Swiss-Prot record:
The chain crosses the membrane at residues 7-27, 64-84, 101-121, 131-151, 162-182, 189-209, 276-296, 315-335, 346-366, 374-394, 406-426, 445-465. Trichothecenes are sesquiterpenoid toxins that act by inhibiting protein biosynthesis. It is found in: Cell membrane. It comes from Stachybotrys chartarum (strain CBS 109288 / IBT 7711). MFS transporter; part of the satratoxin SC3 cluster involved in the biosynthesis of satratoxins, trichothecene mycotoxins that are associated with human food poisonings. Satratoxins are suggested to be made by products of multiple gene clusters (SC1, SC2 and SC3) that encode 21 proteins in all, including polyketide synthases, acetyltransferases, and other enzymes expected to modify the trichothecene skeleton. SC1 encodes 10 proteins, SAT1 to SAT10. This is MFS transporter SAT21. The keyword Transmembrane helix applies. It is a multi-pass membrane protein. The gene is SAT21. SUPFAM superfamilies: MFS general substrate transporter. Its main location: membrane. Belongs to the major facilitator superfamily. Glycans are attached at N238. It holds the Pfam family MFS_1.
């Protein structure tokens, strides 16, 4: 029973922690809107009609605060993820996960207090909630550490199957959270925040009561298989393989001056080409997926849907992703492994297949002539969400190390950088075609298809770099 608890608990933690985040997406905006509206109308208390808050000055104020909050919330994770990833390798995963929960709990509490007592605090003070995310690093660090823990917990033959299941957790939250948040907001606007805080407290309690995430947890659960390393894509230097740790990307003793740093980066790419390609794929995947942020606007603009009804796009995307990562990919992975197919062949095959699905889906979205075709294209795009866990399986095998916290921390950093650069790029492409009161031509979806085409090429390159090792890794 204890063994099964160790196996299941990381998935429960990830499901709950991500639910606490998605549950607050809409309520947080509404709380900020309410506080800003009271400030603009100079009302200290009493009921306020939501329609009165839809004036341009109030909405501009809300957009400014929400936009800056999103930016500030990403800074702690970006600045601290490598530190916490390395610390997780040294101190165990549980301590870092607990820190993430504490910091996020304080951030939720700060926003709640600021908006609840809007007659005392200016709404701009919600931006200070981002400071609490330096305690643990927030959602980004939690995702990196829990992924590293699952990768450490399971042996190579079954690792990717469980990474698929882990990837399904946030997609399940995306399906359930809108309806749950709506029901809670109907009772009280501040109730979703209280429920989210309770969920985070449950996560802390689960971490405190269990041994999950301790440094020795993987060896206790996996047994002798935890000492195995996959002879997959042996691009690491001999010294890094012998020591059981991944060679650092940049030597801190030698990284002095821009030319020396550039030289070290080039040497690392030459020494660890597979890791470099994996990180590049994570960057490109996040960059391409940035176009998904515009699907609601595109459905409303091109096909005349009311914006409030475009939430069906979230349901289509998440439903496809849940079916893919929870059912199709794990079953395919287990079936192929039982037939003796090497794990690395399965992983790279999943990267290749998922990328093809995404290319076809985004081309279909670009060429969609009806709202039904567009919705179907996004449902199909959800089936391509197996790309990320498949890449995680390749990365875990290629890292040649038991301490994967820093490896997956860098992975999340690349994904975040992809999000940050993809947003402005896709926004600019989305604006093409609007001249002369026209509608967008949807070139952002074509760009996404082209980027995923590049990922297909990189998947072939991964195969070329390690075909001999892959055929005999298991």
């Amino acid at each position: 029973m204890l063994r099964n608890t160790h196996l299941v608990l990381p998935f429960i933690l990830y499901l709950l922690f991500r639910l606490s985040h998605f549950l607050l997406e809409v309520p947080t905006v509404r709380m900020i809107e309410l506080a800003a509206c009271h400030q603009h109308l100079r009302l200290d208390h009493g009921p306020l009609n939501e329609a009165a808050c839809k004036t341009p000055p109030v909405q501009e104020h809300v957009s400014l605060v929400v936009g800056w909050k999103m930016t500030f919330d990403s800074i702690p994770g970006l600045m601290s993820i490598l530190y916490f990833g390395t610390l997780a390798d040294k101190s165990g995963h549980r301590a870092i996960l607990r820190l993430c929960c504490v910091g996020y709990l304080l951030a939720i509490l700060w926003v709640l207090i600021t908006c609840l007592f809007h007659q005392v605090f200016p709404v701009e003070l919600v931006l200070l909630s981002s400071l609490f995310l330096f305690i643990g690093g927030g959602q980004l660090v939690f995702a990196a550490v829990i992924t590293a823990f699952v990768a450490d917990l399971f042996p190579p033959p079954s690792r990717t199957k469980f990474l698929f299941l882990l990837a399904a957790m946030p997609h399940m939250d995306k399906v359930a959270s809108p309806a749950l948040a709506t029901k809670l907001m109907e009772q009280n606007l501040f109730l979703p925040s209280l429920v989210s805080m309770a969920i985070v407290v449950i996560c802390v309690a689960l971490l405190q009561m269990s041994d999950v995430g301790r440094e020795t947890a993987a060896s206790k659960v996996v047994g002798s298989t935890s000492d195995q390393t996959e002879p997959f894509l042996r691009s690491s230097s001999n010294s890094s393989q012998e020591s059981g740790t991944a060679a650092p990307a940049i030597d801190p003793e030698q990284a002095r001056g821009p030319f020396r740093q550039l030289k070290n980066i080039i040497c690392w790419v030459h020494r660890e080409p597979v890791l470099f390609i994996c990180y590049l794929c994570f960057f490109l995947k996040s960059n391409a997926m940035a176009s998904e942020a515009f699907i609601f606007q595109y459905l409303s603009e091109k096909f005349g849907w009311p914006l409030r009804e475009t939430t069906v796009m979230r349901l289509a995307l998440s439903s496809g992703a849940v079916i893919s990562t929870l059912i199709i990919c794990p079953l395919a992975n287990a079936t192929l492994h039982n037939r003796g197919v090497a794990s690395a062949r399965i992983n790279i095959g999943a990267v290749h297949a998922s990328s093809i699905v995404l290319v076809a889906s985004f081309i279909m979205a670009w060429q969609a002539s009806s709202s039904t075709a567009f919705i179907f294209s996004m449902l199909a795009a959800g089936f391509g969400e197996g790309l990320e866990p498949a890449l995680q399986g390749v990365l875990a095998a290629a890292s040649q190390t038991k301490a994967k916290g820093s490896i997956f921390a860098l992975m999340c950093t690349c994904s975040l950088l992809g999000d940050m650069t993809g947003g402005p790029l896709m926004s600019a492409l989305m604006s093409i075609g609007r001249g002369g009161n026209g509608v967008s031509d949807g070139y952002c979806f074509l760009a996404s298809a082209l980027v995923f085409g590049a990922v297909i090429v990189l998947a072939h390159l991964l195969w070329a770099l390690g075909a001999e090792e892959m055929l005999g890794e298991d």
